[in-house]
């Protein structure tokens, strides 16, 4: 059973010094890739991808969580099925500076965003087929299925982290 949480989160703290870093154009990135493990060294790459793609799907996990460890390969396969989305693997302990506003109680927890709009946030089963259906269902172009109640400015927050503002 999934538990759903909704919070108003400022997710716009992506490192802004990333603009000064030589980053390959997001168009040059391989459009079919596995999920990206979010880390300070790749904030600029993630910012570029978030600017190039409308959707972000983030799996919030922990390195010590056996369920998360077992699910990682499934999440990577999901990334291959959704090349139009930025698929991020975020360790909530390593990246607490980015996700500290989230109340993650169980793993894995999934966050789906369209731009800055949080479309889905909640604990999910670590089942590839179920998550694929959830992602497809929440990312359709039907506004009634995508009504967001909160925002999370991931790019902006990564920029602030990169600039040392947080």
For each of these PLM feature ranges, what is it?
Residues 17-32:
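Short, Lys/Arg-enriched N-terminal segments with co-localized hydrophobic residues
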Residues 113-148:
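Non-catalytic, surface beta->alpha helical segment in thiol-disulfide oxidoreductase systems
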Residues 60, 83-97:
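Thiol-based oxidoreductase modules, predominantly thioredoxin-like and allied folds used
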Residues 29-47:
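N-terminal "domain-start" segment that seeds a small globular fold
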Residues 141-166:
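Acidic/histidine-enriched, glycine/proline-rich intrinsically disordered or flexible terminal extensions
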Residues 47-77:
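Local sequence-structure signature of Cys/Sec-based thiol-disulfide redox active-site neighborhoods
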Residues 102-111, 128:
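Structural micro-motif
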């Amino acid at each position: 059973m999934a538990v759903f949480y909704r919070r108003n989160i400022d997710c716009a703290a992506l490192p802004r010094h990333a603009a000064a870093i030589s980053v390959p154009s997001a168009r040059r990135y391989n459009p079919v890739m596995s999920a990206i493990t979010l880390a300070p060294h790749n904030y600029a790459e993630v910012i570029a991808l978030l600017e190039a793609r409308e959707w972000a799907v983030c799996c919030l996990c922990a390195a010590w969580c056996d369920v998360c460890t077992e699910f990682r390969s499934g999440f990577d396969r999901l990334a291959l099925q959704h090349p139009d989305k930025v698929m991020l693997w975020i360790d909530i302990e390593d990246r607490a500076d980015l996700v500290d506003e989230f109340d993650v109680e169980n793993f894995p927890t999934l966050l789906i965003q369209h731009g800055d709009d949080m479309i889905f946030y909640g604990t999910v089963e670590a089942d590839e087929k179920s998550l694929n259906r959830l992602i497809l269902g929440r990312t359709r172009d039907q506004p009634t299925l995508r009504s967001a109640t909160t925002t999370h400015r991931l790019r902006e927050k990564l920029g602030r982290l990169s600039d040392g503002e947080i």
